Amino acid sequence: MSEIIIGNATDFNLNNKFSGAITSPPYINAFDYVRILRLETLWLELADENELREIKKKHVGTENLVIKIFDEYQILECSLLLKEYYEKIKIIDNKRAHIILKFFNDMKKNLQMVNNHLEDAGVYSIVIGNSNIRGIEIESWKVISQISKYCGFIEELHFSYQIRNHYLRIDRKTKGGKINSDHILVLRKISGTKK
């Protein structure tokens, strides 16, 4: 029997192991999902304004961050591609560069949590599109694949497809551009690993 777990994708604890998981994380720099779903959330009384602010701070890909002594630089050691993107974007827009680091650091935490709850040789499928940050295309799937090796996974399969029906027609102005294809990344847990 399938069960939907509601909670934080970067910090959860389940009593049982599962054989597979699938996710579609937010695109970097794409939508403020908390803002987009704000009215529905308030109407259904699922959260109040204060709770929404707290949810937004914890959201994977949040743009609510304070650039300070940033403890998330270690993520750069997990992906040469991420390091390259970070260095290029930092010159143009320091805040956006740190948003990218935060996003991939959150994804690393998610990979570690899923690894801890997968059975040996379990499969984790991730559907994600690339993002365009300050004119630089970020191949999110590739960065996640590189990071996953540090979290006890191997890449088993990757393919992409063209998005034919952009059903979310929210005007993004010049922020991130139109995402035309999604990538499917299939990772397999290396037996005996726990991260």
Task: Give the residues covered by each predicted segment.
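Class I S-adenosyl-L-methionine-dependent methyltransferase catalytic core
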Residues: 1-22, 27-126, 130-195
